[in-house]
Amino acid sequence: MVEFLELRGVEGATVLEIGGGVGEIQIELLKRGAARCVNLELSPAYDEEAKRLLREAALEDRAERRLHDIAAEPDGVEPADIVVLHRVVCCYPDYERLLGAAAQRARHLLVFSYPPRNVVSRLFVGAANLAFRLLRREYRSFAHPPSAMLGLLGERGLRRTFSYHTPVWRVAGLER
């Protein structure tokens, strides 16, 4: 993801990361010249570790962390040159609202990762969700249809110019 974005140009860019966790991608993009990063989370669970990592990298003045559901309230977020969603779409039930809001905020580039939709991933998601249900946890995982996700982004003016595959994850880089 970072390499794709760097090849397209991150110098002076604004970055919006949706579900960035502790912020490894944001820190890398800031180190490579991005001007500013905003990270949106649904939970404060990663905040302390993220703040520590930003402090250690001396980048805390160029990063902002917010609790915000962009799919529910897209207008509460400023557009950015680059939008990143790494291992997030699989955690959100309504990929159409999530990716639609992300596309709406992407001025130039959007990159996201997702699990392949095959027998293995569907079995894994089903087993994981059964375990979460038995443990009475609310979290659920999703293997959304890649062609539908990419089609939705295409309808919003983004075209795929990069793809990367591993056995467990797919990465799509799109440009406006």
What are these regions (language model features)?
Residues M1-E11:
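Conserved alpha-helix/loop element of class I SAM-dependent methyltransferases that forms part
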Residues A13-G21:
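Conserved class I S-adenosyl-L-methionine
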Residues V22-D69:
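Class I SAM-dependent methyltransferase SAM/SAH-binding core
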Residues A72-V77:
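Short conserved loop adjoining the S-adenosyl-L-methionine
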Residues I82-D94:
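A short SAM/SAH-binding and catalytic strip from SAM-dependent methyltransferases
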Residues Y92-A102:
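A short, conserved alpha-helix within the catalytic core of class I
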Residues R107-P116:
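Conserved beta-strand signature within the Rossmann-like core of class I S-adenosyl-L-methionine
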Residues Y139-R156:
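Short alpha-helix
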